[in-house]
């Protein structure tokens, strides 16, 4: 039986594509393994998926671009993770390793290359993260979401592989209940802050609940169960799974962070959106670059977190609603999306 090892973690964005691909390989008779951190979100997501995947936990260390005494300890953690991954590779003898990035992926990638296992990696952002910059040196091939990343010799631009489609789904009962609290004459705004929510969105909704719900139906994915609420023109919930796409379909506009997975999902369904990227003080600036790219393409509006107020947000929302057809036409004309089936066939071809 052919074997494939997946790796990637730290955030949901570093796991999502793996979760989409693994069932395909299982259906085709592959034995699927995953290397990650049992304390990480990658382990939680695999357990929730119920997939027949063998999980191997290794030591991990965070990769930092700045000086920290913690770096010294993490060097040893990464080194031990490489040794652990090497033993896993030598024991399994897989046909390939597929990495979605994140600091947990570096030891398996290095170990795979050392043991002669072909390495395929995927980069979602406009500029590579530190983990993928290291992994690229050991990779057989890298697939990129953005065109600008394709100047490197081992990179193939494939566009975004998204988990949503523009196909309408039957409304779940929970959504019907939510809509009974909404005013259908008002536009619906969905705040999405990633897997852990976004405090800045939560605070904005909390501080301006009255003004917002007078003008919009508000859906706020908070990441914080203490904020859960269903009231007139307002639905706040910490986390959703099956309800995620129906909520996207219900929304007229989405206010989101600038993670590549989320904004390309919105592009796939031509959904109006305002991107409020994480600033450079909280990230390496990849979300700012992603947002600027989408604005340049005419897909979205952006708003820096430092400039986010009720007035500035309403200005962006009003502009999008007034120019809805223009934005949607540009999104629908985009050639930057690839279906899961097409990407899977491409990957299998490269593995052969």
UniProtKB/Swiss-Prot annotation:
Keyword set, alphabetical order: Cell cycle, Cell division, Cell membrane, Cell shape, Cell wall biogenesis/degradation, Glycosyltransferase, Membrane, Peptidoglycan synthesis, Transferase
Gene Ontology CC annotation, any one: plasma membrane
Protein's pathway: Cell wall biogenesis; peptidoglycan biosynthesis
Disulfide bridge positions per record: none
Localization: Cell membrane
Keyword field contains Membrane: yes
Membrane topology note: Peripheral membrane protein
Key word Metal-binding present: no
GO terms for biological process, alphabetical: carbohydrate metabolic process; cell division; cell wall organization; lipid glycosylation; peptidoglycan biosynthetic process; regulation of cell shape
Chief localization: membrane
Top-level taxon in the UniProt lineage: Bacteria
Similarity remark: Belongs to the glycosyltransferase 28 family. MurG subfamily.
UniProt protein name: UDP-N-acetylglucosamine--N-acetylmuramyl-(pentapeptide) pyrophosphoryl-undecaprenol N-acetylglucosamine transferase
Organism: Streptococcus pneumoniae (strain JJA)
Phylogenetic lineage: Bacteria, Bacillati, Bacillota, Bacilli, Lactobacillales
